[in-house]
C-alpha cells in the first residue's frame, strides 16, 4: 500500500503544480474578428478521425468549381505530440496536395511548424537554440505556390517528440508551454489571416483549430483542453465515435463541451455499421446535425484519396452547416443591441441617454472577463475585464466558474426545485452548516433563506422589530399601547435595497425621492457618519459638521491598519463618538409620540451604492455598543461587503464586534445565481416562538433555499477560504493578501484629477474632483474616462463621478496591477481634456 500511496501523493502534487501554473498565468485580453468562420475540431476520444474531418472540410472548401484566388483555409494544430513521425498538419498538407491533383484544381499549400521541444527539433536534424521554457523556435516550412489559386495554410504551433499526452511529453522533454502562450499564439495566427482577409471584400476564409486527443485530454500545462480553449469560446465540430460504446462516449464529450459553454455546430463520425446516428439524433433532439462518414479503409497502404472523394457529399454538408451557423451567429449578434433597446427596461438606466452604438453586447463570460462583440470593429470579439464584478456579485476565475457550473448542473439534475418549509435536503443543510461555521461563527444559530439582498433586509427588519418588541414588552401591550412607531437608526449614505421596507430604512437620497418612491417617508434616525479615505498618499478622516471643532486633532492615519486598530476604542475620539450617539439615541428613545428606535442597520465599513465611502470603523463599533446597551437589535447588511469583498470573510473581523442579525447575498454563491440569507441569534429566533402560527415569521419566497443556489453557495464558501483553491488567502487563512499595488495606489491618490481613494480587499474606488454641478449620482462627469477604460479592455460603470474597479477574491494581484496601470495612464488623458 505504501508505494501506491506515495504514487498518489506525487500525482496530486504534480497536478497541483499544473493547476497553480494555469491559475497564476493571466491571459492578456484577446481580440478576434468573427467575420470569417472559425471552428474548433473536437473529438470524443483520440484516434477517431479529427484530422480526416479537418482534411475533408478543407477539400470541400478549397477544391470547388469555380475556384477563387481569394479562397483561403487556415488549419492550426496548436498541440502536436509524436512529432515529426506524426504530424497532423503535414497530413492535411499532403492530402490536399493529392486531392488537388486528382480533381485538377490547383492550390497553393504550405505547412509550417513554429515551435518544438529540443528532442523533436533534433529528430528533424535542426540545430536550434532552446528558450528558457525548453521550447525551440523552428524555421521549418514546406510549401508549393501556385499563383492565383486558392490557398491552404497549415501550421503546427507546438510539437513534442513523444507520442504521449501533451502534459507528459512537456514534462519528460523539459519543454513547457503556458496556457496563456498557447492562446496568444492561436490569436496571433488567426488575426494575421483574418485581417489580411478583411482587406478584400471578396475574400473567403475558413479557419480550423484542431485539438489533440479527446475533449478532456490535458494540454501541455495539464489544463484540460476543454478548459484551455474556453476563453475564446469558438464554436465547435465534434467528431464522435461510431464504434460499439461510441454513443456513450460521444454524448459524454458533447455534454462536457456544453457544460463549459461551447456551441457545437455538428456531430460527425465514421460509420461502423451500428447506426449510432439514430440514438444520437434522438438524444440531441435534432438541435445539432449528425453526419455519418463512410467506413475508413483499414489497409495502411491506402492513401485514402478515394475515401475522401466518396465522402465529399458529407463534407460539403458539414461545410455548409458551419458557414450557415456562423452567418446566423453574426446576424443575431448584429441585431441584439437594437432589439435590446426596443424590448428591455434596464434598471438604473435613463434610456434617453443610451444610444444603440453604446449598448454592450456580451457573448459570454470566462472568469473575470466578458467577451464583448463589436460590429463596428470588423465584427470582432474582444475581452473586457468586468470591473463591476457584474454589479458586485462575481468572484470566480475560469477554473472556479467551470467548477460552479458542474455543481449547478448536478444539483439541478438531482433536485430540480423542491419547496423548503418543514423540509430538509443536503444542499440547504450543508449551506446552513457552512454559514454558521463561517460568517456566523460565534454568534449566529439560525439561517433564514431568501432570494436577494433586499428581501434579506426585509426579513432582518421584521426579526429586529420583533426582538425589540419582545425585549421591551410591546408584544403583550393593549391595543391602544400597540400604536407605537418603530424606526431604525441608520447612517446617511447607506443603501439597503429597493423593496419598500428596505427603502424606509435609509436616509433620503436620489433612490428614495418622490419620483422613485412616492410612499417613502424615511422611518429612521439618520446620522452623518465620519468617513476615511486616502488622499495624496495619506489616510484621512472626514468628520461631519457636528464634529468639525475636533477635525484638526483627528485628521490623519499612518496606515489603513491603524484605522481598524482596536486600541482606538480607548481614544478621546471614541468618547466623543459615544457622547454624540448617546445624545441622539436618548432624544429618540420613544418618550415622545410613542416613537422608538427599534433596530440599528448598517453597511459595515463601506457604503457601496452611496458612493463607495469608507465609514470610520470606530464610529460604527461605538454605535453598535451604544445600541446594544439599550437593547436595540443590531443588523449588519453584508450583502455587498460579505464573503471576502473587503478582504475578510465577514466584516465582523474588521469591526471587532458582532451583530444580532446579518444579511448576505452576492458573493455568497460566487455571484453565479441569486440567493440570500439572513442569519440570526438564538435570542432573535426565540422571539418568534409560540403556540400559534401567527407568532411565526410569516415571510417567504417560492424559491427560498432553492437547491441549486444552496449547492453553489456551499461550493463558493469552501472554495474562497481554501488556500489550495484560492491562492490569495494568507497563511493564517483569515484575510486576503493585498491585491492592489501599493505604489500605484499611492500615485493615483496623489493625482490632480482625484479627490479621494478607497482601497480594501477586492475594491478600489476613486472620486474624481468635480464642482457641485458635476458631482453626485446623476453626474455624467466620468463618461469620457469610462469610454477610455473600455477601449483599454476594462468594463466599468461609474457611480456619478466615482469610478471603481472590483475584482474577485481569486483574482491575481498582477491583473489588479495592470488595471491600475491603465487607470493611472487614462487619468492623465482625462485630466488634459
Curated annotation (Swiss-Prot):
**Phosphoprotein as a keyword?**
no
Q: What happens when the gene is disrupted?
A: Arrested embryos at the transition to cotyledon stages of development. Biotin depletion leading to lethality; this phenotype is rescued by exogenous supply of biotin.
Subcellular location(s): the record lists: Mitochondrion matrix
Task: Please list the residues that bind substrate.
Answer: 81
Task: Name the positions where Mg(2+) binds.
Answer: 51, 88, 210
A Gene Ontology molecular function term of the record: adenosylmethionine-8-amino-7-oxononanoate transaminase activity
Q: Which residues does the annotation say bind (8S)-8-amino-7-oxononanoate? A: 391-392, 495, 666, 700, 797
> For site (Participates in the substrate recognition with KAPA and in a stacking interaction with the adenine ring of SAM), what residue positions does UniProt give?
348
Protein name as catalogued: Bifunctional dethiobiotin synthetase/7,8-diamino-pelargonic acid aminotransferase, mitochondrial
Species the sequence originates in: Arabidopsis thaliana (Mouse-ear cress)
The gene name reads BIO3-BIO1
